[in-house]
């Protein structure tokens, strides 16, 4: 919405409030980003059509996209689900909310941690996950971030300022203990709550998760959009633990992992088909994957399938043979051999340890 300003949006919001009961809606609050020409409204409504009719009757401005959201998720990402207490009141009583919904999102992924052989025993050390995540959450809060979600090996956080997100990430990286057998990956990206995805901050989170599937030699990766938000002294001298990624590479990674996500289960899917979908030659794809992801295309596809299989083993009770076929392996025995070579455990043993949370 080019040329949008907070006062006009406040007036439109008031018109919505006056007519909300006629459409069985409740207009809770909104966010305005004048610089980016973006408005995000939070409305309790029985249907998308009710929201469209309300806006159409109240002021004629039809929403570009409507998605369903959970209040708790909005609160986690944006920090509120009602009007801010410090909203400006004009002389005639108009409440003006001048608060952007643009956020910097942090995603942390811990790849396999403490699966190691000792005296012919396997130790599954869940305490290592907990220690890293506890420290990470503390640094997020200390730098004015908000924890959106946190699991044993994964976390999402939201920040208003790019500098705070970067400093929190650096504090997490600086606190990592080199003696821990952990591959901690942190990625930062900035975005708006509603774009192409039907999930809140869906496109931003999707890219972050794809970036954290990349094998890399630095724990922290930042996108070009995030780099632009940092003060010059910070991005002009990025430490060796940080890597920035160019916009064109972001697009390639999104396209590549989108294809892998959609086709990894197909046993007939191969690199030749992947090249056709990306409109690249095999040599071009090889150069890109080895440069960005440190894998040849064939190894990338195999490792992606193994990674997804590991996810399924950790989160489901499906038989190993079923998981092997669902991730594109034509033979359960070949899958078992590849899994053991990659992770040092038989798939069934890994599944049992993951579910039991053993700490021997």
Describe each PLM feature range:
Residues 1-21, 76-105, 112-115:
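Short S/T/G/P-rich N-terminal loop/turn motif that feeds into the first structured element of a domain
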Residues 2-26, 123-141:
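Short amphipathic alpha-helical segments
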Residues 95-164:
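Catalytic NTP-binding/metal-coordinating core of nucleotidyl cyclase/transferase enzymes
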Residues 127-144, 156-192, 203-216:
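Alpha-helical scaffold within the catalytic cores of cyclic-nucleotide enzymes
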Residues 271-300, 324-349:
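Basic/polar phosphate-binding segments, predominantly the helix-turn-helix DNA-binding elements
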């Amino acid at each position: 919405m080019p040329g949008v300003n907070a006062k006009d949006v406040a007036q439109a919001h008031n018109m919505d409030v006056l007519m909300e009961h006629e459409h069985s809606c409740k207009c809770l609050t909104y966010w305005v980003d004048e610089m980016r020409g973006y408005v995000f409204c939070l409305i309790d409504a029985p249907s998308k059509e009710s929201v469209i009719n309300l806006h159409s009757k109240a002021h004629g401005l039809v929403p570009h996209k409507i998605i369903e959201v959970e209040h708790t998720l909005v609160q986690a990402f944006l920090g509120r689900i009602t009007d801010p207490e410090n909203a400006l009141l004009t002389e005639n009583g108009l409440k003006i909310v001048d608060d952007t919904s643009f956020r910097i999102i942090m995603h942390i992924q811990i790849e396999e941690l403490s699966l190691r052989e000792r005296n012919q025993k396997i130790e599954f050390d869940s305490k290592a996950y907990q220690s890293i995540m506890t420290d990470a959450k503390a640094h997020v809060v200390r730098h004015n971030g908000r924890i959106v979600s946190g699991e044993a090996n994964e976390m999402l956080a939201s920040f208003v300022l790019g500098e705070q997100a970067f400093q929190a990430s650096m504090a997490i990286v600086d606190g990592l203990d080199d003696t821990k057998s952990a591959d901690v990956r942190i990625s930062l990206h900035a975005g708006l709550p509603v774009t192409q995805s039907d999930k809140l901050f869906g496109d931003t989170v999707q890219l972050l998760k794809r970036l954290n599937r990349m094998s890399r030699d630095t724990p922290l990766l930042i996108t070009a959009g995030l780099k632009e938000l940092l003060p010059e002294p910070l991005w002009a001298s990025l430490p060796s633990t940080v890597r920035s990624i160019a916009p064109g590479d972001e697009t390639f990674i999104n396209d590549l992992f989108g294809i892998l996500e959609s086709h990894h289960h197909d046993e007939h899917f191969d690199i030749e088909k992947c090249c056709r979908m990306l409109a690249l030659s095999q040599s071009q794809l090889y150069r890109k994957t080895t440069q960005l992801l440190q894998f040849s295309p064939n190894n990338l596809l195999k490792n992606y399938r193994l990674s997804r299989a590991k996810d399924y083993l950790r989160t489901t009770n499906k038989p190993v043979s079923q998981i092997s076929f669902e991730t594109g392996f034509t033979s359960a025995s070949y899958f078992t051999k590849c899994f053991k070579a990659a992770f040092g455990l038989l798939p069934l043993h890994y599944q049992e340890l993951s579910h039991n949370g053993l700490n021997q």
